[in-house]
Amino acid sequence: MPKTFYEFLMTQRNPESYEPVASFANNAFLDSAFPKQETQFEPLSKYLEENAPYLPSMTIFDDAWQLYLAALA
């Protein structure tokens, strides 16, 4: 089973960083409803668009997704 996006994102956490992906990871950690078992782009994108006011731009998710895909390769 591939690593979930959430598991990958947690490797990007850094409470001391203002880097966008790190900030996204820090906030996703605090989001109790985040789809932690998801590995597919569309359901994650839909969730974030509808439920993640902490994500100022979907471009940040796109960047994190590309990092996730690279980590799986």
Swiss-Prot record:
Top-level taxon of origin: Bacteria
Stored Pfam families: YozE_SAM_like
InterPro entries per record: UPF0346 (IPR010673), YozE_SAM-like (IPR023089), YozE_SAM-like_sf (IPR036806)
Signal peptide: none
Family assignment from sequence similarity: Belongs to the UPF0346 family.
Name of the molecule in the record: UPF0346 protein LVIS_0790
